[in-house]
């Protein structure tokens, strides 16, 4: 006979007490829930199976991981863990809302992704990669060593300025002692190379290298001018620099160029450049326009008696000779005359009535000349025809 209690003795503890089984299940569920709340998937666990399809659908190119790390500016992300005092219900209201899905929602620089589940985080990473691929890359990035490069340029200009000042002072001392001043000529090539560089134009002006240029262009203690090569290189270099009024005040180079403009020993070709530079520098100071439409021309009456008296006296102003002409005169050789352009500053006044009378007189003379010319032309044609043909056999055109 079978035991009636055998079926009950073989039951497990859960089957005997269902309430205890439910309690045990709840105890096991709570740590699993805590683990899921604090669980953060690692980057290698995220799979992007549909990335290629999504990127191909919007016709963009997928960037590489190196480009995403090195060149793409990513948003600052806070990955702080959620405080334990919060409950899961506090995050359920916005758990299903993705970034940018609500109307009027604006993305901020700081985004907390700790409240996102793995699916939302995966979507967020994909949106960032897509926005980085679509974003135009024509924005100029500041170089990491740009500040160091500017500092190096400033140090280079300061060092050259000190060398130029020392060379100028040394030449002044040698000239006062009656020696040959050659320190500036030794340093001229280096100075010309620096002044010719367009990328150093702003550092040259900011570090006031024009002050050293002024010292090089100043006359020596014995009233002699600097070497012609120094004048030529430095004055030509001043044309390429964007010199403003502040730079002129700080360096004082304008006074030296005014001396070169008024001096008779300045080479004519250099004097033209100096005149143009002084005109360009003084125009904004005097509030004058560089347009020829706004240019004012001085007019003066022509004095015939004054001109005839000057011719009768035979006084002719001697023009400044060039270095080539001076060398030829010193060697007692002939020099090829050079062409020179004359610039007039005063325009003569014109009498319109006198011009009209002259035009009418010329018109009457032209009519008389045309009539005489046509008559002479017809006579010459007849003479040529008579000489060529002669009298005919029948006696036509025969003078009796």
UniProtKB/Swiss-Prot annotation:
Renumbered to this chain, the Low complexity biased-composition regions fall at 19-34
Q: Where in the cell is it found?
A: Nucleus
**Polar residues: compositionally biased ranges:** 84-99
Entry GO CC: nucleus
What is the species listed in this Swiss-Prot or TrEMBL entry?
Answer: Candida albicans (strain SC5314 / ATCC MYA-2876) (Yeast)
Task: List, alphabetically, the Gene3D superfamilies matched.
Answer: Conserved domain common to transcription factors TFIIS, elongin A, CRSP70 (1.20.930.10)
InterPro entries in alphabetical order: RNAPII_TF_IWS1, TFIIS/LEDGF_dom_sf, TFIIS_N
Q: Where is this region: Disordered?
A: 1-50, 77-149, 375-400
Family statement drawn from the similarity comment of this UniProt entry: Belongs to the IWS1 family.
Record's protein name: Transcription factor IWS1
Regions of biased composition (Basic and acidic residues) lie at 119-130
Q: Which PROSITE patterns match?
A: TFIIS_N (PS51319)
Q: Does the keyword Transcription regulation apply?
A: yes
């Amino acid at each position: 006979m079978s035991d009636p209690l055998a079926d009950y003795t073989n039951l497990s503890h859960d089957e005997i007490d269902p309430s205890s089984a439910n309690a045990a299940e709840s105890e096991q569920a709570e740590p699993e829930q805590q683990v899921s709340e604090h669980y953060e998937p690692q980057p290698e666990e995220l799979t992007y199976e549909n990335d290629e399809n999504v990127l191909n659908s919007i016709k963009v190119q997928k960037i590489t991981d190196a480009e995403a790390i090195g060149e793409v500016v990513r948003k600052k992300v806070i990955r702080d863990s959620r405080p334990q005092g919060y409950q899961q219900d506090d995050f359920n209201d916005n758990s299903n809302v993705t970034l940018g899905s609500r109307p009027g929602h604006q993305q901020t620089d700081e985004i907390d992704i700790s409240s996102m589940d793995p699916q939302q985080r995966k979507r967020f990473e994909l949106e960032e990669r897509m926005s980085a691929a679509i974003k135009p890359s024509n924005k100029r990035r500041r170089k990491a060593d740009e500040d160091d490069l500017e500092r190096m340029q400033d140090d280079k200009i300061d060092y050259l300025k000190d060398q130029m000042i020392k060379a100028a002072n040394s030449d002044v001392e040698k000239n006062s002692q009656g020696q040959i001043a050659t320190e500036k000529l030794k340093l001229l090539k280096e100075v010309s190379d620096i002044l010719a560089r367009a990328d150093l134009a702003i550092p040259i002006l900011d570090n006031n290298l024009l002050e050293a240029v002024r010292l090089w262009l100043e006359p020596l203690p014995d009233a002699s001018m600097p070497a012609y090569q120094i004048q030529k290189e430095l004055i030509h270099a001043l044309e390429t620099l964007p010199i403003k009024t502040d730079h002129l005040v700080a360096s004082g180079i304008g006074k030296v160029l005014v001396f070169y403009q008024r001096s008779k020993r300045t080479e004519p070709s250099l004097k033209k450049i100096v005149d143009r530079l002084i005109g360009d520098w003084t125009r904004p100071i005097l509030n004058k326009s560089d347009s020829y439409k706004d240019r004012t021309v001085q007019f003066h009456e022509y004095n015939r008696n004054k001109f005839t008296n000057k011719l009768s006296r035979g006084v002719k102003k001697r023009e400044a000779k060039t270095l080539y002409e001076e060398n030829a005169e010193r060697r007692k050789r002939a020099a090829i005359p050079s062409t020179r352009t004359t610039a007039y500053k005063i325009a003569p006044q014109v009498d319109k009535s006198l011009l009209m009378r002259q035009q009418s007189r010329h018109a009457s003379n032209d009519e008389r000349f045309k009539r005489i010319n046509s008559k002479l032309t017809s006579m010459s044609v007849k003479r040529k025809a008579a000489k060529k043909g002669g009298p005919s056999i029948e006696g036509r055109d025969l003078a009796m």
